[in-house]
Amino acid sequence: MAREHPHIVIAIDGPAASGKSSVARALGRKLRYVYVNTGAMYRAVAWLALEKGVPPLDAGRVQQLLHFTEFVCDVRAGESTILLDGIDPAPHLVSAGVNASVSAIASIPDVRRLLTKKQRAFAFDYDVVMEGRDIGSAVFPETPYKFYIDASAEVRARRRANQGLQDSIAARDTQDSTRRTSPLVIAEDAHVIDSSNLTIEGVVGEIFGRLKLKGLPLGEL
């Protein structure tokens, strides 16, 4: 696919608790690119559905709810932000209800189409580090800068527990990798990094080195 946008996109994908969010945020700061957390967008829709009493598995009602909601994506302090009818959902995005609902929300094709459009729009205005589960495979398949961050199931479960989250890593992996629309996959040309025994700085350093090898102009960084 030819690049339709004027800015650089670094795609970082991976399963839950692989460390991709922390890595993507740190890389964005190092490069002075905008950090975009696409998972937060799906979590925002899950929160909205729960707030309005709409079952996350009811695709038709979720789509209708989104149709009548002002969903605004913007950038503040170098990171993506979300407003739903003027309300910032950020404080609610890691609740137990949202954790239990987000995979169902992410499996709704019309939701993915809407959010993919919003995600691609960032690259018309900014150089971005964008993380999620289908950035390199579906949202920006044309970018040459693709990374897949993974870790062992044991390490990922421990990280979730340290975050105060008790949801099942195995169940979430199954949901994400078997959904019909944009499942979690490793993009064919992605560079895979196992973060199990690496610090955030170590993963960022490996990505940085790979970007240099790919010829990304990094200036004096």
Question: Where are these predicted regions, by residue range?
Answer:
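N-terminal phosphate/diphosphate-binding loop that engages ATP/GTP or pyrophosphate donors
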Residues: 29-95
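Hydrophobic anchor at the beta1->P-loop junction of P-loop NTPases
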Residues: 12
